[in-house]
UniProtKB/Swiss-Prot annotation:
Highest taxon above the source species: Eukaryota
Catalysed reactions listed for this entry: L-glutamate + NH4(+) + ATP = L-glutamine + ADP + phosphate + H(+)
GS catalytic domain: residues covered: 108-370
SMART domains: Gln-synt_C
BP-aspect Gene Ontology terms: glutamine biosynthetic process
Taxonomy of the source species: Eukaryota, Viridiplantae, Streptophyta, Embryophyta, Tracheophyta
Compartments where located: Cytoplasm
Polar residues: bias regions: 58-67
Entry protein name: Glutamine synthetase cytosolic isozyme 1-3
Summary of the tissues where the protein is detected: Expressed at low levels in spikelets (rice flower).
The keyword ATP-binding appears for this protein: yes
The gene coding this protein: GLN1-3
Amino acid sequence: MSSSLLTDLVNLDLSESTDKVIAEYIWVGGTGMDVRSKARTLSGPVDDPSKLPKWNFDGSSTGQATGDDSEVILHPQAIFRDPFRKGKNILVMCDCYAPNGEPIPTNNRYNAARIFSHPDVKAEEPWYGIEQEYTLLQKHINWPLGWPLGGYPGPQGPYYCAAGADKSYGRDIVDAHYKACLFAGINISGINAEVMPGQWEFQIGPVVGVSAGDHVWVARYILERITEIAGVVVSFDPKPIPGDWNGAGAHTNYSTKSMRSNGGYEVIKKAIKKLGMRHREHIAAYGDGNERRLTGRHETADINNFVWGVANRGASVRVGRDTEKDGKGYFEDRRPASNMDPYLVTAMIAETTILWEPSHGHGHGQSNGK
């Protein structure tokens, strides 16, 4: 089949011949980092997730169920436009349930939605901005794009936000992803080349509550699809190359209504104090392999210490100069790894800063979110 005919068929506009649309159902797989999807035909356009049919998949093939009881049910939660099929076709972010209606253990969205629907959390309108770093790897050899085979490029310095064939690798993928996310209706706010060559970042936000997780996951899915087309592998490993190279994080910027209002800086300081008290619990939920990244070098704080500061990129939590000057604003949690689950991280930050109350100054207080 000629490639031009294939391209024509892939780009067929269905609206001329049928009202039917294609819905690509997306879910998080058993590793907590793999994105799975499959498509089905709908009789016409749908823009409300509650009007979409539930569906199922073989959970024994994704590490989410056993072979003798393998059915997992998909509940549609958020709809985005499909940048690949275009037209009225859609991407659908789903979460996963057992046939009895209970959320399965890997369904972090369920608990996040519960925390974000708590009246105290809702009243605070938590905003998130997530900086998703990732590394582009050459297929088959798992070595960063633009790096010599079995060798290393020159040391870090020239690559961050750089242009030029000797410094910037994979920009076509990054730009395709940026535009595809905007087309999809994802609140992507920017992109940049990172400190390590072959590493890039996109930013999602500001997005309120559980939607932040939906936007990050669908943006990751779109990136996986684009790199698939380009024949490149995307890695969310927090430290893909050992040694004197920057790791990959998912810095999470956060503010509540109280923090954005006059006197907000005091609220921010109290929230950061609470985060420090629960440092260990947060680190446990902030991504696998993070200890390889949070070493106290390469713009990170040591994983065992909680430090915060104004404009300090070697801190666990950073407050911007503007926030300090204005007496209100937001802060940045720099601890989450690039492979973190945004549902888990965003909900945990809201729970600790809004619902959790320390008991006698120790890190094991109660949350009012039960």
